Amino acid sequence: MADANDRLFTAIIEREDDAYVALCPELDIASQGGSIEEALSNLREAVDLFFEAADPRELRERQRGHVFVTQFQATRG
């Protein structure tokens, strides 16, 4: 069961060479790992550490509102 302090964040994960990079756009925090699962776990840890260290002012300044992720089609010239 989720804790009252838990919040749902977005993770955008992409492959870069031999690693995966995970980005949390709401906080502009990124991490990486050798697999998708490791990158996500490392991102979760980075966000947890940020919340432990950040003061309330930094949290307000850094935290963005809702992030919308979608796909679109474009024609290559």
Language-model features, listed with the residues they occupy:
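Short, charged, surface-exposed hinge/linker loops at domain edges
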Residues: 1-12, 37, 41-77
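A short, exposed loop/beta-hairpin motif centered on an aromatic-Gly-Thr core
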Residues: 27-36
